[in-house]
Amino acid sequence: MSDYKKTLCLPKTKFPMKANLKQREPEMLKRWEETGVYEKMVEANAEAEQYVLHDGPPYANGHIHMGTAMNKVLKDIIVKSRNLQGMKAEYVPGWDCHGLPIEHKVEQELKKKKKELPTTVIRKLCREYAAKFVDIQRKEFKRLGVLGNWEDPYLTMKPEYEAATARELGRFMEKGSVIRGKKPIHWCCDCRTALAEAEVEYEDHTSPSIYVRFPLNDEKVLKALPEDVASKVDLSRTYVCIWTTTPWTIPDNMAVAVHPEFEYAVTEVNGDIYILAERLLPVCAESFGWESWNVLATVAGAKLEGAVAKHPIYDRKSPVVLADYVTLDSGTGCVHTAPGHGREDFETGLKNGLEVYSPMNNSGVFLKEVEFFAGMNVWEANPKVIEKLEEVGNLLAQEKISHSYPHCWRCKEPVIFRATTQWFIGMEENDLRKKALKAIKDDVEWLPAWGENRIYSMVENRPDWCISRQRNWGVPIIALICEDCDEVYNDPEWVFSVVDEFEKHERGCDYWFEKSIEEIVPEGLKCPKCGGNHWTKEDDILDVWFDSGTSFAAVVEKRKEHRFPADLYLEGSDQHRGWFHSSLLASVGTRDVPPYKTVLTHGYVVDKDGRKMSKSIGNVIAPQEIIDQHGAEILRMWVSAVNYQEDVRISDEILSRMVDTYRRVRNTCRYILGNLDGFNPETDAVAPADMLPIDHFALDLVNRQHEVIQKAYTNFEFHKVYHTLHNLCTTELSAFYLDIIKDRLYVSGEKSLERRSAQTVLWQTMLMLLKDMAPILSFTAEEAYSHMPEEMKGSAETVFAIRPELLKPSIDDAERKRWELLMDVRTEVTKAIEPLRREKVIGHSLDTKITLFANEEIAKALEGIERREFFIVSGVEIKPLAEASDDAVKPEELEGLSIKVEKAQGEKCSRCWRYDTLGTNAEHPELCPRCAAVLAG
């Protein structure tokens, strides 16, 4: 018997079956860096339309986690896909380097020494700490295969960035939008600083819930009542009732607010008179333990205005005032009002001339003037206030409640509302709120669409933007304060001159902290209010959200890689209240336009059960763990596979599925590359019109799937890319087309039309696969590209620079429907053969002959194709459906067809393994006529 294996055109490629990603990926990263792959990708589109994805800066603190890894991979997919689509998309990564978390870490390392060190030294240590983690995270992001300008990222602590941030503040000052005043803001007693809305997280918290009575010995109460009722009221035993979950604010009470239109019940209980909302009376009575009560009258809240109650602890007045925000959802309908500790309280205080009283230090400790509670922090004061109220007889009831309460994003401790002198950007100044809302509706595409309503509601209801922080590590608020009268000097011309110095200074805005007041104050400057000349520098720094929110000015407008406005901002959905929000206000406030055209958000990464990752639960999966076990490619594939616009799950099981999918895609690439050996497109390519029918159809099929994938990239539907690519490789290629043409590729003459026709489709398929894979499976696409025969590559030195000119088949819908029907027929034939294989009657489908009893439509569809090749059998006979034998299989899912499967007749060809008549060629007695003809040339 002759060895005919050598006469077959078997696949030949050095592209390995085993990926060995953990070893190969670092080698490829090194090669990318040495050969400048990122630059080559961008240069390929040097003259093309620019696409700007502006990177939201991650915080330079700690290692990357799954959320930041997913974010960076998503951005990388977009940048690479846009470049491969012919746009010039450059990626400038950035880092947020200022702020409390870094300062906290430095303080922890310094311990008690921090009090002895000047601000300049603390800032130097913060700068070094941030720089260290920029380097750590940069290596971790690069390990994910993310391409970008890693050597020149933007850092919010660079002098040019700090200057740009300060300049934007100057622009707001120039427009008159910056206000300095005393207002209640979120305050963290542990961090000793104001907090922005975006720095507050709401968590479940248990608080004391107390009902308190305020003595109301005022004749005005009697005037509000009918005469017959007034005569029964003993003012010395009359009270207005309030409810609060913050007992510590009772010492700072300045008023009691009622709704002008609500009805209030004047209720007698054991000789005492209580005033509270009529609708809430039954619930309150139960809480107070009243077994019986008598409503003497009801009175509109408006009639109680001006009555003066007495503070429940101190000898101080608490007037009754009107407020529309009072509700009947809970409490008593009478609201304890402390203008120093609540936004609505503050507004009510302004309207009614109440003192904004908040006698505590930055740690939330009551000052000496606060009788009974001096020296206690607010949380220590809670039980003491309750004790005092009980002692003086004004505590009606107390209990514990669990509710959603604001906590500091950094230290995770509960925060308070506290009125302090702060700097604000006024939301009504220059119509900032109105302009921002219009921009949200008219000028930005929000993906998912619900993002629009979310940010619209936030901007619509937000207070003025508190931009000051009482810390060291950040950009200073450039202003001088008169020591004699507290007047502010922030003339824009002077502000911009200081900004210019920041830009020149080696350490940027350290200039402000290093220079003495004499070096900074303009010569001869006198206070315009009092004429004094004693000035001090403003100590506060800018909110880090203002820092990062002005990145459009520092980066998008300034760097050659970008242009304003950016095409896309992409971050987690929490950034509707964070970076998207601050960037919008900063841009609209100075330029009247938003900084972005499209805003795309992703969800959080959770575990397999949908739980948030937490060290305490022990369910944290770090990116490095996945890379060490599977390689970055598998993590990248996972990012593409999930619907990232929602919260996404990750687990070992999910990653195992990714590994299986990856293996199938890799094997498909390897098979195609192996069968392209010896193929030169310039001399061997077959025009679509000259191809074999199935090749023509396959080319059309792959083209259509390629278009689906490219459209999905354009629409940010990466899970659609993943599923289409997976289906193409496993079903439409491996299980269908590649399976069918294997015989022809191996057995036909090396240069025959049959083989070259199939190879042309494989060449085109590989080009499309590379373009479709590269944004996601970047390492594998580059590896596969490096193993392509040189004559197929063109001038591109990297897969990210390929711009393939694809052959376009011309197939009409009728022909497509014909092939879809044929694919269905083939599926049913495969099913019919399977029982024989399972029962070991046959070893391979080539051991069979099939008879198809077909209706007219199916019979016609089967005309003009090489049927034995199509069904991978040794014989095919077509007969009318009416002649179907009893032993024929009748498919349930395809009408008009019956299939009879039997063992093939003839002898098995030693070369192609088909059963046929052998020995027609005396030189090759073991071969079928087809194989003998191939060898005869």
UniProtKB/Swiss-Prot annotation:
Stored InterPro entries: aa-tRNA-synth_I_CS (IPR001412), aa-tRNA-synth_Ia (IPR002300), Anticodon_Ile_BEm (IPR033708), Ile-tRNA-ligase (IPR002301), Ile-tRNA-ligase_type1 (IPR023585), Ile-tRNA_ligase (IPR050081), M/V/L/I-tRNA-synth_anticd-bd (IPR013155), Rossmann-like_a/b/a_fold (IPR014729)
Major location category of this protein: cytoplasm
Note describing how the cofactor binds: Binds 1 zinc ion per subunit.
EC number: 6.1.1.5
Cited CDD domains: Anticodon_Ia_Ile_BEm (cd07960), IleRS_core (cd00818)
Chain sites annotated for binding Zn(2+): C909, C912, C928, C931
Residues reported in the UniProt entry to bind ATP: K615
Domain of life the protein comes from: Bacteria
Catalysed reaction, written as an equation: tRNA(Ile) + L-isoleucine + ATP = L-isoleucyl-tRNA(Ile) + AMP + diphosphate
Positions occupied by motif 'HIGH' region: 58-68
Keywords assigned by UniProt, alphabetized: Aminoacyl-tRNA synthetase, ATP-binding, Cytoplasm, Ligase, Metal-binding, Nucleotide-binding, Protein biosynthesis, Zinc
Localization annotation: Cytoplasm
Binding site for L-isoleucyl-5'-AMP: E571
GO biological process, alphabetically ordered: isoleucyl-tRNA aminoacylation
Motif, 'KMSKS' region: chain positions: 612-616
Domain remark from Swiss-Prot or TrEMBL: IleRS has two distinct active sites: one for aminoacylation and one for editing. The misactivated valine is translocated from the active site to the editing site, which sterically excludes the correctly activated isoleucine. The single editing site contains two valyl binding pockets, one specific for each substrate (Val-AMP or Val-tRNA(Ile)).
Family note: Belongs to the class-I aminoacyl-tRNA synthetase family. IleS type 1 subfamily.
Subunit and interaction comment: Monomer.
Protein name per Swiss-Prot or TrEMBL: Isoleucine--tRNA ligase
Gene name of the encoded protein: ileS
